[in-house]
Swiss-Prot record:
A Pfam family per the record: bPH_6
Main localization category: secreted
A GO CC term assigned to this protein in UniProt: extracellular region
Record protein name field: Low molecular weight protein antigen 6
Subcellular location: Secreted
Source organism of this protein record: Mycobacterium tuberculosis (strain ATCC 25618 / H37Rv)
Length: 112
């Protein structure tokens, strides 16, 4: 569904690109957006969480996570035992039941 929005953005960018060819580098924006839609994600299982970013990934065991923080309109952040924070792409307060199930109950479900 998000790729449809990128497609419409691309169509909108074609107007300035076709009328003023110097603006052709603007077409990099939809490519970058599609790459981020495909790449950014959080994978959780009973062992831990794997966070994928645009250029890499990081795996963290559940034992290394001290808690989760949420900011309005933002993805969750895992507070690690060493005091650092790890952003969890696509994890919001609404998706916590999925994280509860994947973590075998280590993350409490606020909706129960």
């Amino acid at each position: 569904m998000a790729h449809f929005a990128v497609g419409f953005l691309t169509l909108g960018l074609l107007v300035p690109v076709l009328t003023w060819p110097v603006s052709a580098p603007l077409l990099v924006i939809p490519v970058a957006l599609s790459a981020s839609i495909i790449r950014l994600r959080t994978l959780a299982d009973e062992r831990g969480v794997t966070v994928r970013t645009l250029v890499g990934s990081r795996a963290v065991r559940w034992d290394d996570i001290d808690g989760l923080r949420f900011h309005r309109g933002s993805w969750a952040r895992a507070t690690l035992k060493d005091g650092t924070e790890l952003r969890l792409p696509a994890v919001t307060f609404a998706t916590l039941p999925h994280l509860t199930e994947a973590s075998s109950g280590r993350v409490p479900n606020p909706y129960r």
